[in-house]
A protein has these predicted regions:
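Beta-propeller folds
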Residues: 1-475, 481, 493, 781, ...
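Cap/lid segment of the alpha/beta-hydrolase catalytic domain
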Residues: 347-359, 498, 505-624, 628-630
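Active-site-proximal cap/loop segments of hydrolase catalytic domains
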Residues: 566-809
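Active/binding-pocket-proximal capping segment
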Residues: 336-352, 393-407, 447-449, 491-499, ...
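Glycine-rich His-Gly loop
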Residues: 274, 433, 478, 553-557, ...
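Secondary-structure transition/capping motifs at alpha-helix termini
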Residues: 135, 150-152, 294-300, 317-319, ...
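Blade-level signature of beta-propeller repeat domains, shared across WD40, Kelch, NHL, RCC1
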Residues: 478-480, 485-488
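Hydrophobic/aromatic beta-strand patches that form the interior of the parallel beta-sheet core
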Residues: 51, 96, 238, 248, ...
């Protein structure tokens, strides 16, 4: 009986176990078998890398390559290879190839991932980060820094979380680049916080999804979300000196932006931060900077300057830190050895800031040309000239050009991208811009010799490249009707004279078969009595006995582009000038001259005065004038149709219609708040909405929508990351409510300007049809007459115009 009871109890226990664990618990246990090894996770295999000697034609092929890096001198090639799926003997490797001998050494094996390869200047040292210990799907992986030098048998571990100098909670940052100093004595890398990982046991539908905006956040939530990937990869610079086993941390949460000085050879780095000043960027558009020098030997920080509106940089040899203070409108230097701060521009007799800037804000500087060898001088621009300045502020500044006298602007064109300074006897290339004619030229200059005669031509000369072993410049030569590649000698007495240039190309030869355009500089007196400038484009076959329709296109100031080539192309947002002139239009592009607090009236003063002036010419049909603009130009178009009825049609792309609602909005492309734009930037209102509400109302087209008589075509796309899409909707719905003639073209998924060519072609057709109908009396397209209902979306675009006398099936 007892034995039967024990059997019954055993069966009962098995049944209960089966209820909880499943029926497998009732199965007869199998004999232990040797566990089969788990197959390795498949990897993304590398591809073939072919290295060819261009002189001999000899080739070498490397298989399964996932990454590679040549040294600067080409003497070393580092290759990372993957394992081959299905081949248990295949492993990932890092290979060192000496290109001269062809010798191949495997210097690193048995790892899951390796990246951020960096070679020193001589191609004899290598650093990289690698991860060896985690499974493929691990949520957290710890990378380590490895180092190899010629002569070692393999790469050695140099830095991990336990290395001296690595603070608790930090690890090697696997997302950052690694750099050697120029002399190879230091290795710069990054450490990063060990971030918490997501709890995979949490179920999405049981957890809240939200963003919390806090008034003390450095950045608004939309900006944080736009930058979240960048922030998750953020690290802090650190350095390991050759022969040392201790890491020196150079950056941290307080000074996060660190740059090398003298290519890393200096005994300090430059660290800048905006910490403590970021909230104000919401309405200022900038954050004040503080700058420090940080020792690479012990991490000690010394302040250079605090809470300055400006950007700091080190001189090439590292003797000075230089910055422009926007509020003081001066350049300052910090002498690293003495700690002295000098105002190096105080004795420059002219404005080194943009005196033509018309924003209610501190004007920006014209910038610097760079430094002379050994940090002897720093060169500072004014509007016209270049000033040689003593970085200690003891010598008087000297202008090395004479542009102001002749209304010419000189700027240095750096021919050698790797050159960090200029030498006194070095041939330099200066570009020249004629502020009167808008022509361009170049000059051959030596700092230790007087300036030569300069030449200016009705052309644009850009993109200069010097031949490495010859005194010849290759460049882009543009005129309004041609765009070609040319060469010119880079020698004394020859470079500036364009007659010495040889044109090498004949780009767009088919252009001769089309009606092109001419462009002239036009000047007129505005309503406020001041003189204005603009560009007027006429058809190549212009006939002064005929009358032409006119489209005014504008943004801010474009006259300096007088001699630039303009290519016919589908429109991203604005009218294509070659297309419209070729089709019998005159296009006028007037400069806009702004006054603080009056952006709308400034546009009226500039554009309408230009229209009145142009109307005096017999070849202008003053009843057939239109305006078109995009973004800021779109706003000005929207404002102008509330102020005047002289235009027969208008096109406004991405216009701000209501400055009161747009003021607190977000630029969704960047996550930035829009307040700074209205207070200090493009809108130029000069105050907050609550300080100057009357300016926001006066300059908002929406509040004068009842005055509009001009047919208005609006384009505003539903993925606009710059101007909120609802601004176009506010304007359109107001005009629709008032019974005005208005159209809103909205491209799905498109940003501020159109990207997809199919949409650009479509907009080009609609712009042409819209203006042809209103200015030339052409038959209107169906979309103009009756729109396109949602039921016909993707079936009928409404752009097909049937010829007169024919009916569609």
């Amino acid at each position: 009986v007892d034995s039967l009871k024990r059997v019954a109890d055993s069966l009962t226990a098995k049944v209960n176990e089966a209820k909880t664990k499943g029926l497998t618990a009732l199965q007869v246990p199998k004999k232990e078998e040797k566990k089969a090894s788990r197959p390795e996770d498949p990897v993304e295999e590398g591809t073939d890398l072919v290295v060819r000697n261009l002189l001999t034609g000899e080739e070498k092929k490397y298989k399964l390559v996932t990454d590679y890096l040549f040294s600067k001198k080409g003497n070393t090639l580092v290759i990372e290879t993957s394992k081959k799926n299905g081949d248990t003997l295949s492993k990932a490797n890092v290979i060192w190839v000496s290109t001269a001998s062809g010798k191949v050494d495997t210097i690193f094996r048995k790892f899951n991932d390796a990246k951020s390869f960096s070679l020193d200047e001589e191609g004899t040292q290598l650093a990289f980060v690698a991860e060896r210990d985690s499974v493929a799907k691990a949520l957290r992986k710890f990378y380590k820094l490895y180092y190899y030098s010629i002569g070692q048998d393999s790469a050695k571990l140099r830095v991990d979380r336990s290395t001296a100098g690595i603070a608790n909670g930090l690890t090697v940052n696997d997302f950052a680049n690694i750099q050697f100093s120029k002399d190879g004595s230091k290795m710069f890398f990054q450490v990063a916080p060990i971030r918490p990982i997501k709890d995979t046991n949490l179920v999405d539908f049981e957890t809240a999804r939200l963003d919390i905006w806090h008034y003390n956040d450095d950045y608004l939530q939309p900006q944080q979300l736009r930058q979240v990937d960048q922030e998750l990869r953020r690290g802090f610079m650190a350095v390991l000196e050759k022969g040392s086993d201790k890491v020196i941390q150079l950056g941290d949460e307080d000074v996060e932006n660190v740059t090398l000085v003298n290519e890393g050879n200096a005994d300090y780095v430059l660290a800048n931060t905006t910490k403590g000043a970021r909230v104000a960027a919401q309405w200022q558009g900038f954050a004040l900077q503080s700058s420090y020098i940080v020792s690479t030997s012990d991490g000690n920080k010394k302040p250079v300057a605090k809470n300055v509106r400006g950007f700091f940089s080190a001189s090439p040899s590292g003797k000075y830190v230089v910055w422009y203070d926007w509020q003081k409108k001066q350049y300052f230097t910090y002498n690293v050895e003495s700690g002295a701060i000098s105002n190096v521009s105080k004795n420059i007799r002219t404005s080194i800031w943009d005196e033509d800037d018309d924003h209610p804000d501190d004007p920006p500087p014209h910038g610097t040309m760079g430094w002379q060898e050994n940090d002897k001088y720093v060169f500072i621009y004014d509007k016209y000239d270049i000033w040689k300045c003593d970085p200690d502020g003891k010598e008087m500044p000297v202008a090395i050009t004479n542009g102001r006298k002749n209304n010419l602007t000189y700027r240095y064109w750096q021919l050698d991208r790797d050159q960090r300074f200029v030498k006194e006897d070095q041939p330099l290339l200066f570009t020249i811009f004629d502020n009167k004619s808008k022509g361009n030229g170049i000059a051959y200059v030596r700092l230790n010799k007087p300036m030569q005669q300069t030449y200016v031509y009705p052309a644009a000369q850009i993109g200069f490249v010097k031949a490495e072993n010859a005194n010849v410049l290759l460049y882009n030569l543009q005129t309004p009707s041609s765009h070609n590649v040319a060469v010119i000698p880079f020698e004394e007495n020859l470079s500036g004279n364009i007659s010495n240039a040889v044109v090498l190309s004949d780009i767009n030869p088919q252009q001769k078969d089309y009606n092109w355009f001419t462009v002239d500089l036009m000047k007129w007196k505005m309503f406020d009595g001041k003189m204005a400038e603009g560009l007027i484009y006429k058809p190549e076959n212009f006939d002064s006995t005929k009358k032409y329709p006119v489209i005014f296109y504008f943004y801010e100031k474009d006259v300096d582009t007088r001699y630039f080539y303009r290519a016919p192309a589908p429109s991203a947002s604005t009218i294509n000038i070659p297309y419209f002139t070729s089709n019998g239009y005159i296009v006028m592009d007037p400069n806009i001259y702004y006054k603080d607090g009056q952006p709308g009236e400034s546009a009226y003063n500039s554009v309408v005065s230009a229209a009145k002036y142009l109307s005096k010419f017999k070849w202008i049909d003053s009843t057939k004038m239109a305006i078109q603009g995009q973004s800021w130009g779109g706003y000005q178009v929207a404002y102008l149709v509330t102020r005047t009825n002289i235009f027969a049609a208008a096109g406004a792309g991405a216009p701000v219609a209501n400055m009161t609602s747009a003021y607190g909005g977000i630029r969704w492309g960047s996550g930035l708040n829009r307040q700074f734009q209205y207070e200090r930037s493009q809108s130029r209102l000069g105050g907050t909405l609550w300080e100057k509400p009357e300016l926001y109302l006066k300059n908002s087209p929406l509040f004068r929508a009842d005055k509009v008589q001009t047919p208005l075509l609006i384009m505003h796309n539903d993925a606009d990351g710059a101007v909120p899409w609802y601004q176009g909707i506010e304007l359109f719905t107001a005009l629709r409510r008032l019974g005005k003639k208005a159209w809103l073209v909205q491209y799905n998924g498109e940003d501020h300007n159109l990207v997809e060519r199919r949409n650009r072609k479509d907009l080009s057709i609609r712009l042409s049809q819209f203006f042809d109908y209103h200015l030339k009396g052409a038959k209107p397209a169906p979309w103009i007459v009756s729109g396109v209902p949602a039921t016909m979306k993707g079936i009928d675009w409404g752009t097909t115009v049937e010829p007169e006398g024919k009916k569609a099936f």
